[in-house]
Amino acid sequence: MRKILVIVVTYNGMKWIDRCLGSVYASGMPADVIVIDNGSSDGTPEYVGKHFPEAVLISTGENHGFGKANNIGFSYALEKGYDYVYLLNQDAWIFPDTFSRLVDAMEKNPDYGVISPVQMAASMERPDPRFAVKCLDRPLAEYVAGNVYEAPFVMAAHWMISRRCLETVGGFSPAFRHYGEDDNW
């Protein structure tokens, strides 16, 4: 069984965190979770500590931004020997088979460093507009469920990263506080 670490960076994410973390723990494939809280003032870290005590919680005390906070999680993943890291935005969630499908795709394609599911809008009726513009080069209906497609860019809201890739590329540049880290990576 491959070891997966899910990194969730939070900042005042109370309205989303229950669904986000709940979806991870309802996954059909076990994963550990580290929550890096960027100085929330809405009770997010306290809620995580009380309702998701199995998650590792690191409170930075201030907003370091997406990249720097994820780098804390990257270091933890490498130190603890995880095979895969999954970046999950605080306002996002996964389906029960997300990890098993992505790990299967990574195992069948060991040259892949990063893989992502199609990122849907909250309505689940269409892809997230930012994902569609940057990642899809044809109408969604032309993609076959279960297949893997190369994309020029994938937003880091849902990234599964292999350990090998993380060791090769390293973390995000601290020059990017919020947005652009994934494009630069």
Q: Which positions does each model-derived feature cover?
A:
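Short, acidic, metal-binding catalytic loop of nucleotide-sugar glycosyltransferases
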Residues: 22-31
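Short, flexible, basic/aromatic active-site loop/helix in glycosyltransferases
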Residues: 117, 132-152
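Cell-envelope/extracellular polymer assembly enzymes that use nucleotide-activated donors
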Residues: 3-5, 32, 184
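Glycine-rich, basic loop-to-helix element that forms the pyrophosphate-binding segment
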Residues: 60-80
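Conserved donor NDP-sugar-binding/catalytic core segment of glycosyltransferases
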Residues: 95-129
